[in-house]
Amino acid sequence: MNTLLMSLIFTTMTYEMPKLPYANNALEPVISQQTIDFHYGKHLQTYVNNLNSLVPGTEYEGKTVEEIVAAAPDGAIFNNAGQVLNHNLYFLQFAPKPSKKEPAGKLGEAIKRDFGSFENFKKEFNAAAVGLFGSGWAWLSVDKNGKLHITKEGNGSNPVRAGLKPLLGFDVWEHSYYLDYQNRRADHVNALWNIIDWDVVEKRM
């Protein structure tokens, strides 16, 4: 298991919550403590609990969450595994005071190559996140050839299903932003850029 991608702990028949590298109120005002308490403490905990109830006795017992998402058909196991994977990547990509405003190194070079500039990338990514109908996720991923892709994933899906490696994900389920932004999804998406820990995202390459 890639520990940089999968920091939730897996033991026999048990999936556990990832440990946040910041306090529940540390991302304010972008994400409030109340949202973290509910989104991380309630929603993600429910997905983890559900997965621990669903997997034992199935062909997915002993598999990592990433392996389950890549192989499972649509259904309860896939939905909960997808949301555990998605939220693990999501919550661990943030920092209260990121060390830089945009990626550098290999990821920064790839963004300029594939999107022209970081600003062009942000515009395309924002359009995907804001334009996704209903609940789901916007992702930046990389394929086996090193090319970057922006994808929209409905509900609990994840780019690993298409053989891609997810690097950066924005949650646009209403539960991720409604307490702070109500129906203003675009404001939520724009604000998230201020707390992205590009050091973490770069290591996922």
Model region roles, listed by residue range:
Residues 2-11:
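Sec-dependent N-terminal signal peptides
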Residues 12-205:
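Feature for soluble, non-membrane regions of globular proteins
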